[in-house]
Amino acid sequence: MALLQISEPGMAPAPHQRRLAVGIDLGTTNSLVAAVRNSIPEALPDDAGRVLLPSVVRYLDKGGRRIGHAAKEEAAIDPRNTIVSVKRFMGRGKAEVEGAANAPYEFVDAPGMVQIRTVDGVKSPVEVSAEILATLRQRAEDTLGDDLVGAVITVPAYFDDAQRQATKDAARLAGLNVLRLLNEPTAAAIAYGLDNGAEGLYAVYDLGGGTFDLSILKLTKGVFEVLAAGGDSALGGDDFDHLLFEHVLAQAGLEVAALAPEDVRLLLDRVRGAKEALSAAPQARVDVKLSTGEKLAQTITRDTFAALVEPLVQRTLGPTRKALRDAQVSAADIKGVVLVGGATRMPVIRDAVAKYFGQPPLVNLDPDQVVALGAAIQADLLAGNRSGGDDWLLLDVIPLSLGVETMGGLVEKIIPRNSTIPVARAQEFTTFKDGQTAMAIHVVQGERELVSDCRSLARFELRGIPPMTAGAARIRVTYQVDADGLLSVFAREQHSGVEASVVVKPSYGLGDDDIARMLEDSFKTAEVDMRARALREAQVEAQRLVEATEAALVADGDLLDASERATVDALVASLRALAPGDDADAIDTATKALAEGTDEFAARRMDKSIKRALAGRKLDEI
């Protein structure tokens, strides 16, 4: 009889039965796809042997399009219909797109995510990204010889909910099943850690075309634990290009507004080429013939470029310091620094990293490929292609705290930043007024104490709360962040069981510097925030006590004589007058005075309630 072949759950029993899954690095400048083949992760090339696909899409009339290298080569002749660096637009509104005024595109004034008008119609960043992803999917299926079961797609660690959701939407549009959204620095650590069997504390310095991430990871016996993450969602190699572009224009006495769109794109391409050349040579030339016939020729030295971009280099060190502080480690504790992203090839970056951490960075893996390789390893695991040596665990984190608005515009943090995901946390709240039958749940993101200083993510209402006295209802609010970093919120009234929930999908994501600014502001203004919170709490308590006292006077004012009533009225009036002010101590003092001044009144009301409850009842009935 035939023998039954038994394999561990989740493990493919034979190599020919491996489920095909890939890792995709959807980058600002370039994108690529990788897969595990013969137990080794490798980037998959196109027919010409190129692994990098320029993240460029050119739209033609009658539904035609060019993607990748062909589109990049034609960008200068048709800049309005050739979309580059689309990742910068993902999950963002027009007002949040840095440099939108100088871009050659015709932006459509529409609510939500920014859209671009082309000869083939209006396109969203999700649609453009889907074209790139579909091209990579086709490359993978052609190379691997079968359909894919799914893909792990990498995103910057500092991408917010909207940007992550936009990425998933693009993948679905491209016909990809998303197994996981994986933070780019974490993917790099997986590739590096598994490749080298590394253990200890590592920093991943990820400077891509449009984003910067810095993550601190602890690698221990197959466990990849992200201790802290920092970054800037609007800082990348493109910004270095634009600084050099502006310098070249200034040296030539030109202004960008005076250039034709095709000249802007052509000059940007030449400037980018010069920047890349400076990584290997002490100087580089920028030679351009503009559409006007004017020739522009300049020599850029490495020292000139380094001085020019020094402010941008320093911008990367701010989040680096914060991440180290959050992880409660110092630069000296870091065993190695992994560089990710093509922009880290710049000597000025490598020198700055080496100086800050006191050691040369690790560059034995291609910074353009390392993220995709790590994603491929994770995809292979999630597809069920585990082998005996694949017992490793990934523990990632959320970059910013998630909270809920409470009475007085205060923020109650439910999940603090750098919490390991997936995670679910719950907290109980109650009603503020007697007979309250509904509660508005306002979900916010940020590190500040007041709602007005944080980013609003979503709002929903819990209705059907049974009428009770203030403080009697128990509403349990649960925040749940999945492995992709996406948030769902649930609210349930414990007595009645009524429920409400929302999957957080903001119309578009955080602004250019919102996330970094939120963290920076929280450190700079911590003392001010705490004072503001104390004032708001005092005001809320004062309002509650005034309303409760006035309600009691209406119901049982006859329990006080004229003199006592006058005293209580005076205390109420004093507190009502102070409550809107900004003197928390004075409000607290007046609140305490009213509370103490109504102690006797409260006791009489209690006696009256007890007598009413016992009236007409015999002793043996009690």
Swiss-Prot record:
GO biological process: iron-sulfur cluster assembly
Source taxon at top rank: Bacteria
MF-aspect GO terms: ATP binding; ATP hydrolysis activity; ATP-dependent protein folding chaperone; unfolded protein binding
Gene3D superfamilies: 1.20.1270.10, 3.30.420.40, Actin, Chain A, domain 4, Substrate Binding Domain Of DNAk, Chain A, domain 1
Name of a matching Pfam family: HSP70
Keywords: ATP-binding, Chaperone, Nucleotide-binding
Function: Chaperone involved in the maturation of iron-sulfur cluster-containing proteins. Has a low intrinsic ATPase activity which is markedly stimulated by HscB.
Similarity comment: Belongs to the heat shock protein 70 family.
NCBIfam families documented for this protein: HscA (TIGR01991), PRK05183.1 (NF003520)
The protein's name: Chaperone protein HscA homolog
Source organism (scientific name): Burkholderia mallei (strain ATCC 23344)
Organism lineage: Bacteria, Pseudomonadati, Pseudomonadota, Betaproteobacteria, Burkholderiales
